[in-house]
Curated annotation (Swiss-Prot):
GO terms for cellular component: plasma membrane. GO terms for molecular function: P-type potassium transmembrane transporter activity; potassium ion binding. It is a multi-pass membrane protein. Residues 217-244 are annotated as: Disordered. Its main location: membrane. It holds the Pfam family KdpA. This is Potassium-transporting ATPase potassium-binding subunit. InterPro entries: KdpA. It comes from the Bacteria. It is found in: Cell inner membrane. The system is composed of three essential subunits: KdpA, KdpB and KdpC. Keywords: Cell inner membrane, Cell membrane, Ion transport, Membrane, Potassium, Potassium transport, Transmembrane, Transmembrane helix, Transport. Part of the high-affinity ATP-driven potassium transport (or Kdp) system, which catalyzes the hydrolysis of ATP coupled with the electrogenic transport of potassium into the cytoplasm. This subunit binds the periplasmic potassium ions and delivers the ions to the membrane domain of KdpB through an intramembrane tunnel. It comes from Ralstonia nicotianae (strain ATCC BAA-1114 / GMI1000) (Ralstonia solanacearum).
Amino acid sequence: MNAFLLQLAIYLAVLLVLARPLGTYMARVFGDAPSRAHWLRSVERLLYRVAGVDPRAEMGWKHYALAVIAVNVLGALAVYALQRLQPWLPLNPQGFGAVTPDSSFNTAVSFVTNTNWQGYSGESTMSYLTQMLGLAVQNFLSAATGIAVVIALIRGFARHSARTIGNFWVDFTRGTLYVLLPLSVIVAVFFVSQGAIQNFDAYKEVTTVAATTYDNPKTDAQGNPIKDAQGNPVTEKATTQKQTLPMGPIASQEAIKMLGTNGGGPFNANSAHPYENPTPLANFVQMLSIFLIPAALCFTFGAMVGDRRQGWAVLASMTILFVVLAVFEMWAELHANPMLAHLGVDQAVGNMEGKETRFGVVASSLFVTITTAASCGAVNAMHDSLTALGGFVPMFLIQLGEVVFGGVGSGLYGMLVYAILAVFIAGLMIGRTPEYLGKKIEVFEMKMTSIAILVTPLLVLVGTAVAVLASGGRAGIFNPGTHGFSEVLYAFSSAANNNGSAFAGLSANTPFYNVALGIVMWLGRFWIIVPVLAMAGTFAAKKRLPVTVGTLPTHGPLFVVLLIGSVLLVGALTYIPALALGPIAEHLAR
């Protein structure tokens, strides 16, 4: 535990050192002086001319929301088309065929919504062109969308008596050009230095040092599996010394995968694969990359509203929630897995099932907490192999709404929605009209807040109920009982909150889950974005109220406690009954 606390302290210290200047820089990027890099400003102006965009023309919230939805619909159509046309497109050295319609739909929605849920195995499904032009591009654009939306909300708080909240195309372009691209280049070069691969070679077949013996299913002349009288597959022993090593442009996709809190990797093993995450140092940088922009945006928020203490208060709330749950996760994983203990397995170092030996329990547990606190979903250990309580932590973090740092942009605007709820509750307690940052919280804002908070629980709980009742949903559950229910609950929690990680024991690459989770991902993204932009518009139009003796300070310890309490209260009331049927019941049964 001491090693974990030391690594956690170092991680948070380095994160703070990097996030503060980045946050200040982003405040300039989305202000009047985007950058001193004149060549980037020239590129920016060129992009506006090519696209026919007037960067000086600002938008109301409805126009802004339509632009957000339009660009994401076009992105989803492009990714879908790339997958379906894959056999006839270049950069496909393995000759992969077209992806099925339901899987193409799921993947297109997944990457456009910043979820990166993957029901397929990347190294055996997607060509290099599909990975680069489709998935990696959406890693940039989905992150830029989140940044643009939160910047619009911040402008709503910062402006008064205004009808506009900015220009989406400008925010979208600047987020990509000035923030995501430069950081991705730096991180990608670092990953290459650590051993992550970056090439366009065909897959390599190599001879292993030792032969591998495995059970190979027997088939008849038509290729159908042969089964015995009990219906079990008939197998025969086979031995091989050949292994296929996947190749590809990995480091470049890995960088934006982490920085954009996307999470979807080129390989099925994700960041547990040595070609994606080769060393403990690379692993540390991956964890830093996940939280870097979400943490920096808190400083951007403080700078743009003219009170840096506001950003510190939000960051403190996020950090306290994160540290408490990270320590609990580590405690759970340092304990032996009861199922393995019954088999006499040595677990002196904790639960190592599903973890890479080069990372161990400490780095794996920290990664688990970070990737689910943010809406990243990348994994360096298998979440389905966590202990019952170890699996409870990432699921609960996701169900809190991805507001503990959260996704790029989405984490902060989600936490600001809870901040509005917190001041509303405080206003009810003292009998005053609530206000936040000098803006009065009225009926419309509370309606939008309620929608933004209630959408994801509705999608999660209804989706889970439908899945366990429908035959198509039950067919994907291979682990019966409480753990099987946990797998389904985790899948819909991950999809609705745009995380993308999974309890991978669930067989989710089926028409039922591909369509159901695709719908949930889309609604979970845009049914929150639209209410947030609506609030941005109404806040921008309001007059700023003067601070009085009765105004609740939203930059001190009391507000931090109120904000944390609001997040936990909503999460507990909404999900504890479902969690009691899953990971909690599983833990008590052992």
